[in-house]
Amino acid sequence: MPGRRIIAIWFPYMGTERILRKTQHSLGKPVVVVAKKSQSEIISSISAAAQYKGLFVGQSLRDASAICPNLFVQTQNSYAETQFLKGICRWSSKFSPWVATEGNNGLIMDITGCSHLFGGEDKMITHILLAYDELGLTTKIGCADTVGAAWALSRYSETVSYTHLTLPTTEAV
């Protein structure tokens, strides 16, 4: 009997892409979302353009503004971000009935028994990537036998958008 198959979906720019969808702002201009931490404003989400300029999550807005003076800055709205992710989670149930939010910028999806409906695991993942792309969301997907492995692949794999891992069975070990 085949084991469970889990997909972890990470939206690395979710905070800024939510803003970009709402404001119809130019994709080429660096965008950051900032949160108040103590006496300073810290970047909580960046756009791909901001990352290209050398900005990173956790950086102070003061430092980021010195590096990139033409930043488009928005204040973080945690409630709106949470509701946005919950909406994506509900929408994603068209791929699998077992979808849950993971943190503030990811989903976990159990695709055991579902992938054949899309023509196999690889085709299902391609379908998911294209669907999120149509929504204007950047995604990295990891697929593995366990939640932890899928999560790690989605965040730390060197591939651009999709990584895949099948753990050896006990018979193979």
Model-based region annotation:
Residues 1-108, 113-115, 120-130, 139-143, ...:
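Residues that scaffold, gate, or flank divalent-cation-dependent active/transport sites
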Residues 70, 169-170:
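A very general structural signal that marks isolated residues within well-ordered alpha-helical segments
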Residues 143-157:
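Short, conserved secondary-structure transition motifs
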Residues 163-169:
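Conserved small/polar residues in nucleotide/adenosyl-binding loops
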